[in-house]
């Protein structure tokens, strides 16, 4: 069964792999935005050789990704070596943006969820995979999304970056589709969540597991890394 990231909010607690309850932190309102008014965090520079990804997560699931006092997101950072930050969103947004910044060089082998296969990967690839795996764990409890279903992942990118993914006449994206076996769509502007910038477009990759291959082939065919920027 296909699931999306647009499920209605739920009030149940999130359970970790140990079976212990991991309630959504009280510091976050039901839409995932902070209850307390506070200045926005300073921008994060993207060092040379690093790549930045902005992942979309429904607000009803973001508490389970963050964890109580940030314990889960801190563990994800420790495990992958990535910088991970949940960005503030307008109160009208049903989604939050998870910013992932990590080295783009391939330097490790990782196991893919639901498979005994190990693949070579960069810290960026591993971090994106692990964040989405956590989102799916939360979704299974909060929204009853069954394991093994076809689930898509959605990322935000600036229009100029999306142009590099598509290529002239759609040649690049078609080659990535053939090589990875994934379905890739650039969604129309009216489907953008309010947490997106006016210069953003949304890329959907399905099934989510192919995000690993998609990132690899994206680098290979476009040579495009999102460097020296502030987020």
Regions from the language model: what does each represent?
Residues 67-70, 167-170, 207:
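Periodic glycine anchor positions in long extracellular repeat architectures
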Residues 154, 161-179, 183-187:
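Alpha-helical bundle protein-protein interaction modules that mediate dimerization/oligomerization
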């Amino acid at each position: 069964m296909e699931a999306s990231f647009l499920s209605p909010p739920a009030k149940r607690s999130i359970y970790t792999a140990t079976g212990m309850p991991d309630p959504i932190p009280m510091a976050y309102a039901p839409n995932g935005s902070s209850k307390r008014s506070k200045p926005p965090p300073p921008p994060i520079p993207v060092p040379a050789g690093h790549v930045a990804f902005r992942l979309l997560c429904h607000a009803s699931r973001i508490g389970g990704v963050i964890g109580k006092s940030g314990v889960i997101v801190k563990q994800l950072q420790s495990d992958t070596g990535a910088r991970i930050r949940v960005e503030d969103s307008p109160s009208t947004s049903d989604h939050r943006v998870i910013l992932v910044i990590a080295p783009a060089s391939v330097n490790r082998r990782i196991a893919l969820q639901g498979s005994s296969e190990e693949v070579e990967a960069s810290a960026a690839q591993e971090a994106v995979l692990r964040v989405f795996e956590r989102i799916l764990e939360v979704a299974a409890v909060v929204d009853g999304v069954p394991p093994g279903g076809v689930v898509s992942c959605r990322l935000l990118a600036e229009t100029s970056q999306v142009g590099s993914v598509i290529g002239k006449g759609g040649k690049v994206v078609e080659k990535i589709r053939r090589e990875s076996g994934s379905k890739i769509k650039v969604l129309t502007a009216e489907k953008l969540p309010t947490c997106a910038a006016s210069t953003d477009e949304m890329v959907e990759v399905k099934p989510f597991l192919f995000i690993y291959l998609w990132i690899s082939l994206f680098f290979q065919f476009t040579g495009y890394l999102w460097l020296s920027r502030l987020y």
